[in-house]
Amino acid sequence: MRSIIYAPPTPSPAAPSPSSARSRRIRNWAATAPIPLLLIAVILAPGAASQAAGTPSVLISDAAIAKLPTSGAAWTSLKKYADSDDGTADIADQDSNNDVHTLAEALVFARTRVESYRTRAIANLKAAVGTEKGGRSLALARNLSGYVIAADLVDLRLAAPDFDANTFRPWLRSTLSEVMSDGKTLRQIDEQRPNNWGTHAGAARAAVSVYLGMGSELARTAQVFKGWLGDRSAYAGFKYGDLSWQANPNAPVGIDASGTETYAAGSDIPLGGALPEEMRRGGTLQWPALYTGYPWEALQGATLQAEILSHAGYDSWSWSNQALARAAKYLTNTLKWPAIGDDTWQPWLIDARTNASIPLPSSTKPGKNFGFTDWLYG
């Protein structure tokens, strides 16, 4: 079997210095500038009100959303979710869809500025606070990201400043260290579980970190994610199960490295791009592999996490030789397990960021934590 040349890992992640330096220069200037000049700067700066009141956007800027279409199948699908019954906020229910309905409402508001969508989204945000009580960490990990992104899209810090400052933000901060019914916190799950639990937790942790402006927390999240993708020099603290799908059982990773394979059952078994911790859910190493939907489920969290980190300035899509693109191609091309159901949003985002050249579903369904990518990135 032809081996693929493996690109060595990039250095441990650090928040991009140019933007940080630029921010420091702006703060230093603001501290000494005459008041009239400050007023002029606020008036002229694009999105000045939002920037003055809070943190950078979590996932996508207002300017980017303004360029998206308000017609076509993808828009119609998004609008349907925004207009339909969004149910009841219940973060403790790991199968709740209220978060993605809230996200849909926020996206439609951000594009159309129709106030009724923001009103509904904010009502759901208020209802969601505290509903994680009694639930497992997986439920919190799945459901939290959509609410955080929605809060950013509706500009909660300006639309409902008292709620945002006194309730929503303190609550978000508490979710990172809140002990859930399984005895774990979101941080612990992110740093210990190299499966879908951990990737969803990482996405939620990244979203909260950006929304709250927690730079150190975001850097740690990026470090853990880089380790999961395959750079054990960045992080290697995960607890793995059956290692039979690992290309190197002595150095397990979340996604097997490029060009790796193993010999079993009388044949060479390709492993490059496999998610070992989820492939084992279909059974110990064998070929053909027994089908399991867990690899795509783990990629839900990983895909959103990569996009949040990328938007924050990290080169997350390229880490470990484009690990997420390799994983998607392994599932789609090698195993012939294309994304189906609530995983169909992933190929659109992965392909948009990596040119993976994987088949794009003609329509998508939102997943556990995100969706509407055929509209956002199509």
Segments (PLM) and residue ranges:
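A short glycine-threonine-serine/GTX helix/turn-capping micro-motif
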Residues: A289-G293
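Extracellular glycan-targeting catalytic surfaces
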Residues: Q51-R193, T199, A203, A222-G237, ...
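Aromatic-lined glycan-binding groove of carbohydrate-active enzymes
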Residues: S216, R220
